[in-house]
Amino acid sequence: MKRTIILMLDSLGIGASADAVRFGDEGANTLGHIAQACVTGNADNGRKGPLTLPNLTRLGLAHACAASCGEFPAGLDASVTPIAAYGYARELSSGKDTPSGHWEMAGAPVLFDWGYFTDKQNSFPPELLDALVAQGNLPGYLGNCHASGTEILDRLGEEHMRSGKPIFYTSADSVFQIACHEETYGLDKLYELCKLARQLLEPYNIGRVIARPFVGSKAGEFKRTGNRHDYAVEPPMPTLLDRMKAAGGDVISIGKIADIYACCGITQQHKATGLDELWDMTLAQVKTAADQSIIFTNFVDFDSSYGHRRDVAGYAAALEYFDSRLPELLALLLPGDRVVLTADHGCDPIWTGTDHTREHVPVIFYGDTVQPQDLGMRDTFADIGQTIAAYHGLPVLDYGSNCLPEHH
């Protein structure tokens, strides 16, 4: 039996990479700064004391962080001997966005520059907006600016409900986001509008169009729902997932994974919202997945609910919850199963602004076929995909080196 379970801890960076200075991220360290805040009592909102991650520490997360940034995360147990192969990887891709991190991990780094809408106000070209209004039969639009997704709902949600005008906004990422009320505007109508935007954005090289449905009746009460949908461009070359699917194996997407890869190489999709549901669905799939399967879960909340919102205590509590569920997974593993833990970028909750941070990510392999060892620094996230491809006997990927060449 050979199955690989990939747990993508979205935004759990473990120290700034050498090129972080290019991004204004020199000194960022998502895990390190959360641990530090916990030890100094600056993350006691709803939780208390030092960061408690016994299972992740046994798997080598803290050791990988120490190797990456030169300092063991405050409050975590440095006396533990890791039971997994652990290391850290730097990013080859030119950006620090979600698709770049995910695609590179699966063997397809993004070596081109995405398009961005850099103007904070009147962010979108008039000809794009005119085409959306005309082809989407819209009464107009709201927003047309950079904004945080929660703040813009408080500002424009009520007007959107009255007027039926969708809210268009962007961020420092290569995204075009559309927020509409699930009930007054309608989910299907929002999805159709996003598909139109995806087509019209082709010449602008924008990575993702994101549907941001919400509910509620007035400012201060609006809440985004779990029906978010991402419309991504396809990866620039075949990925690990395409290789597995082509070989007749299963690629089981949980949460955002299918959206991020534009459904390329996915054989099964399972929706789940929130860390608890994502964990429940992951465990359910591990119980039933066949030989030659990849079960791939994106734990988005670390990034969307805590990293971008710069909520240190929330991020710490979420990590502790994640850690508390790990033993359930380890208890289900069969001989030949491997667990991979990694991240797609950083999003340091003590950093300025609300953007991602350019960081190293953890590279952790665990299973009965994996010799515990220090994997050191990996030159690209693609080493993860190459290692998984080799284990499953798939064709070699264009990028990356096998971290565990002697293990098959």
UniProtKB/Swiss-Prot annotation:
Reactions this protein catalyses: 2-deoxy-alpha-D-ribose 1-phosphate = 2-deoxy-D-ribose 5-phosphate; alpha-D-ribose 1-phosphate = D-ribose 5-phosphate
Residues annotated to bind Mn(2+) 1: 10, 344-345
InterPro entries registered for this protein in UniProt: Alkaline_phosphatase_core_sf, DeoB, Metalloenzyme, Phosphopentomutase_DeoB_cap_sf
The keyword Isomerase is annotated on this UniProt entry: yes
SUPFAM superfamilies tied to this protein: Alkaline phosphatase-like, DeoB insert domain-like
Chain sites annotated for binding Mn(2+) 2: 303, 308, 356
GO cellular component: cytosol
Domain of life the protein comes from: Bacteria
Gene3D superfamilies for the chain: Alkaline Phosphatase, subunit A, Phosphopentomutase
Pathway recorded for this protein: Carbohydrate degradation; 2-deoxy-D-ribose 1-phosphate degradation; D-glyceraldehyde 3-phosphate and acetaldehyde from 2-deoxy-alpha-D-ribose 1-phosphate: step 1/2
NCBIfam families for this protein: deoB, PRK05362.1
Similarity comment text for this entry: Belongs to the phosphopentomutase family.
Protein name: Phosphopentomutase
Species, as recorded: Tolumonas auensis (strain DSM 9187 / NBRC 110442 / TA 4)
Annotated gene: deoB
